[in-house]
């Protein structure tokens, strides 16, 4: 919203090879409702300049915002497709006013019903499929020759706070900036959300971490299983056990492995459930968050603490 041509030239001079532009929506009415400024420069102009530099471009959108309709979001996706981004992401708006108080303001503007929100995603997915994009994981769409598509075909897809990436280039994520979250193998750490404090600490050479969470061994196991399900729509218990150097039973013990509940999902056509593995069906892939949540011990009796899957 604030960058002019000079700013973009400075970024290009840094040698970045991929840019992700957080658009949210092209509809000015929607942007005003969520107190978001439109881009200072036409997004088409920015994308073209970044392409000229040899960089790849991702466009990120959010569906489920106040003021959005299936038709308006379809127009936004159509405009994005015309730019032919290398990747396009459709994030579901997470309404968690019990965590972010300011979100209560958006309730006054009226949030789309859940059924309409789901239709926004389905319509976008249909548009992108017709345009030749491949659906990756929960929310990414990529060109057929993209590294993510190749990783998915090899069941080597990985996901972190930045989105999806091939497992072969997976590394720990170190956060820079206010409120950024570092994702480490054994812990998570979040930087302060206070801008003044962040500037003060960095100028003094101090860490800006405000809070953290150390993962217990079983949580690290559960994270691997859920990540595999969300990335590759598939978990083989023996393969997972070998990767983690534990038994298949120990893998299941780290989960909320509720056979009757999982069997109900299988009966509904969302998953295939076998003694050797669990896999999402094509019909079940849009509901991968729901399946993952059913396996997560942290979600038991805590559904209201987290954003809704759709």
Describe each PLM feature range.
Residues 277-281:
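Minor-groove-contacting beta-hairpin "wing" of winged helix-turn-helix DNA-binding domains
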Residues 248-266:
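Short amphipathic alpha-helical interaction segments
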Residues 13, 231, 261, 267-268:
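The C-terminal cap of the DNA-recognition helix in HTH/winged-HTH DNA-binding domains
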Residues 283-310:
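Short, amphipathic alpha-helical interaction segments positioned at domain boundaries
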Residues 1-251, 309:
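C-terminal scaffold of the Radical SAM
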Residues 208, 234-235, 271, 301-304:
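Intrinsically disordered or highly flexible coil/loop and linker segments, enriched in small
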Residues 264-276:
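A short, conserved structural fragment
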């Amino acid at each position: 919203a604030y960058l002019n041509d000079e700013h973009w030239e400075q970024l290009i001079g840094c040698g970045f090879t991929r840019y992700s532009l957080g658009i949210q929506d092209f509809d000015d009415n929607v942007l005003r409702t969520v107190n978001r400024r439109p881009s200072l420069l036409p997004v088409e102009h920015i994308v073209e300049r970044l392409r000229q530099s040899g960089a790849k471009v991702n466009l990120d959108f959010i569906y489920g915002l106040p003021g959005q309709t299936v038709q308006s979001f379809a127009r936004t996706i159509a405009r994005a497709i015309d730019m032919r981004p290398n990747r396009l992401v459709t994030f579901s708006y997470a309404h968690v006013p019990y965590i972010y108080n300011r979100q209560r303001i958006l309730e006054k503007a009226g949030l789309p019903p859940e059924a309409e929100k789901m239709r926004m995603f389905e319509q976008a997915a249909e548009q992108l499929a017709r345009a030749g994009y491949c659906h990756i994981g929960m929310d990414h769409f990529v060109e057929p020759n993209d590294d993510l598509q190749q990783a998915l075909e090899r069941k080597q897809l990985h996901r972190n706070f930045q989105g999806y990436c091939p497992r072969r280039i997976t590394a720990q994520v170190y956060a820079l900036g206010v409120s950024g979250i570092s994702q480490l193998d054994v812990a998570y750490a979040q930087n302060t959300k206070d801008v003044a404090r962040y500037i003060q600490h960095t100028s003094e050479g101090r860490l800006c971490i405000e809070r953290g969470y150390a993962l217990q061994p079983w949580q690290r196991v559960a994270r691997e299983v859920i990540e595999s399900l969300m990335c590759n729509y598939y978990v083989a218990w023996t393969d997972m056990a070998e990767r983690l150097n534990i038994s298949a039973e120990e893998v299941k013990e780290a989960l909320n492995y509720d056979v009757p509940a999982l069997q109900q999902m299988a009966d509904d056509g969302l998953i295939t459930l076998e003694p050797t593995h669990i896999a999402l069906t094509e019909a079940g892939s849009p509901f991968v968050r729901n399946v993952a949540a059913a396996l997560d011990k942290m979600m038991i009796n805590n559904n209201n603490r987290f954003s809704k899957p759709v």
